[in-house]
């Protein structure tokens, strides 16, 4: 089968032929019909892969700590060899898709061969193996193309759950990419009043047309003033940050937009300084 992979060392993409995967007792084999490109996540993964070793270390201090621990227990030479081996590997891309079940592990219930499912954690491949708990049946009225958004949509929904908001709450969404647009729509569908902010005028227009009561191009103090007027001087009940930037501006701006004791949730990939 064909699968899209990326070099860990340099970020180069390749479409490769790989063996058909085998499933375990808790897994499901699915023939992919649609897979979703999560632009923010996949762009960040590719940017990290293309970075120098020093830049990789700064971006992933957790991995640096793993390397240090391994060097202490196994020695320097085995650690260097392990790091080089990891850098020479290729990793699959993608995590949100839909397709038709081909085979079901013996411990899986709720789906059977022939069912259409939305899947999470699967890459861009002709056939995918996913945990049975990450394969959700798709209603007949929902297309495969729409079902492929399920995992990304669940990320947006989880951000709103962490925000702990209800009908009538005022929610500001900072960053109107794919996850931000879904967050705004889900908040609106939950009965919230929604304001969206982004640096991209096109993204702001999309939100204004589909999901927000107020959509703003980020303009510093003017944006803060507009949010205060929209919230009648109170500030937002929750600020959900779905931006993708190395800058800490979104996290620094959020308190200016929020009321006293509001909730600020970071869903995106932003600086935290």
What are these language model-derived features?
Residues 205, 210-273:
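Glycine-rich cofactor phosphate-binding loops and adjacent beta1-alpha1 units
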Residues 116, 146-220:
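Mid-domain Rossmann-like dinucleotide-binding core that forms the NAD(H)/NADP(H) cofactor-binding site
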Residues 111-112, 165, 258:
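Short, well-ordered loop/turn sites that connect or cap secondary structure elements
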Residues 34, 115-117, 127, 170, ...:
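Residue-level marker of beta-strand positions
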Residues 78-87, 96-121:
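A glycine-/small-residue-rich N-terminal strand-loop-strand element
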Residues 92, 120-133:
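A structural motif shared across PLP-dependent enzymes of the aminotransferase-like
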């Amino acid at each position: 089968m064909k699968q899209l992979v990326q070099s860990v060392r340099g970020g180069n993409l390749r479409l490769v032929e790989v063996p058909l995967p085998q499933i375990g007792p808790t897994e499901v084999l699915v023939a992919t019909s649609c897979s979703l490109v999560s632009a923010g996540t996949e762009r960040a993964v590719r940017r990290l892969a293309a970075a120098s070793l020093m830049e990789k270390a700064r971006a992933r201090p957790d991995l640096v700590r793993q390397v240090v621990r391994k060097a202490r227990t196994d020695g320097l030479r085995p650690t260097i060899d392990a790091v080089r081996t990891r850098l020479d590997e290729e990793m699959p891309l993608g995590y949100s898709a839909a397709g038709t079940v081909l085979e079901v592990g013996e411990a899986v219930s709720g789906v059977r061969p022939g069912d259409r499912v939305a899947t999470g954690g699967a890459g861009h491949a002709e056939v995918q193996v996913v945990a049975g708990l990450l394969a959700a049946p798709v209603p007949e009225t929902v297309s495969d193309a729409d079902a492929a958004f399920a995992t990304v949509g669940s990320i947006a929904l989880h951000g709103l759950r962490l925000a702990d908001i209800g009908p009538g709450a005022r929610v500001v969404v900072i960053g109107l990419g794919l996850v931000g647009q879904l967050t705004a729509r889900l908040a609106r569908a939950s009965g919230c009043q929604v304001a969206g902010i982004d640096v991209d005028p096109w993204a702001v227009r999309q939100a204004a047309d589909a999901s927000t009561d107020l959509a703003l191009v980020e303009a510093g103090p003017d944006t803060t003033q507009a949010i205060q007027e929209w919230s009648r001087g109170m500030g937002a009940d929750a600020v959900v940050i779905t931006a993708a930037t190395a800058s800490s501006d979104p996290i620094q701006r959020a308190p200016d937009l929020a009321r006293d004791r509001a909730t600020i949730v970071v869903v995106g990939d932003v600086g935290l300084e």
